[in-house]
């Protein structure tokens, strides 16, 4: 299971990195948002050594507040810097290859439609970064998927972070559509007061309507109020052919309807084949 995924993600781009003050602004946001924040280093402007140096300085600045460091695409840098996660973009390394380079950290995939979301789930990505949800200057002319993209990405049960044109005013509708959290570039990094901007985003996020849990070692999110029986139904499994272990305790079939799932629960589903 990955550690509790932050709900607010501050993502850099080449412009933000080129402007400087990434460490200082990241530190200010981390002081305001703590473990609810992840700082993503996403840039093609820095070579490996320079990116690693920046990643380590950001990690030193945000870690005391419980904030995540996330590195995009460069699993080697993520591992060396002690990042909490690595995100593979369009055309990037497969999840299994990222895990080979950076074992023990969360692996996410950028997705842009229902097909890429399903592919990322099949690969075993821990969470998805879905976008662009709204029109954004960082990807002009790329279009936007809106809440429908979020719903499609969340349909498979992975936690979804929505990115693209995000503002505090838009965040609520995206969470209602099924996102776990939101990511922003300009609304955070370009703010006159990054700490205040981070607080504004967090204040705008309604309580999530999904429950994060682990099923057979993989992170998933299910609708709030789901029971063990409901989980089996969502997965298309017949309770008569599955042994269900909930937080290391076997649950009888006739009790599955009465066991609600809570955040952080661990579920093991063991298929068996009868014979005669």
Model-predicted regions and their roles:
Residues 139-144, 148-151:
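Substrate-recognition "cap/lid" segment bordering the active-site pocket of phosphatases
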Residues 137-141, 161-164, 218-221:
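Short, glycine/charged-rich beta-strand-loop motifs at protein surfaces that mediate ligand recognition
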Residues 1-95, 100-126, 142-145, 157-160, ...:
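Conserved N-terminal beta1-alpha1 strand-loop-helix module at the mouth
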Residues 209-275:
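Ubiquitin-like/PB1-type beta-grasp interaction modules and other compact soluble beta-rich domains
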Residues 126-133:
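Non-cysteine beta-strand/loop elements that form the S-adenosyl-L-methionine
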């Amino acid at each position: 299971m990955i550690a509790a995924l932050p709900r607010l993600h501050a993502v850099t781009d080449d412009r933000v990195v080129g402007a400087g003050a990434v460490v200082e602004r990241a530190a200010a946001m981390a002081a305001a948002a703590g473990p609810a924040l992840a700082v993503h280093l996403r840039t093609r402007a820095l070579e490996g050594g320079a990116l690693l140096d920046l990643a380590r300085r950001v990690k030193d600045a945000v870690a005391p507040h419980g904030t995540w460091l996330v590195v995009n695409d460069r699993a080697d840098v993520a591992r060396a810097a002690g990042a909490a996660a690595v995100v593979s973009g369009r055309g990037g390394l497969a999840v299994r290859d990222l895990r080979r380079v950076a074992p023990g950290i969360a692996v996410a995939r950028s997705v842009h439609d229902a097909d890429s979301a399903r592919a990322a789930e099949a690969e075993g990505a821990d969470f998805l970064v879905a976008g662009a949800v709204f029109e954004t200057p960082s990807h002009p002319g790329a279009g936007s998927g809106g809440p429908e993209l979020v719903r499609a990405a969340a349909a498979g049960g992975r936690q979804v972070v929505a990115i693209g044109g995000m503002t505090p005013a838009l965040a609520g509708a995206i969470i209602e559509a099924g996102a776990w959290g939101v990511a922003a570039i300009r609304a955070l990094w370009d703010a006159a007061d990054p700490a205040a901007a981070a607080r504004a985003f967090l204040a705008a996020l309604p309580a999530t309507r999904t429950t994060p849990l682990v099923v057979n070692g993989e992170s998933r999110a299910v609708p709030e109020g789901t029971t063990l029986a409901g989980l089996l139904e969502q997965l298309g499994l017949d309770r008569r052919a599955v042994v269900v272990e909930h937080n290391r305790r076997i649950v009888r079939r006739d009790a599955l309807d009465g066991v609600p799932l809570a955040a952080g629960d661990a579920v093991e589903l063991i298929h068996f084949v009868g014979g005669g």
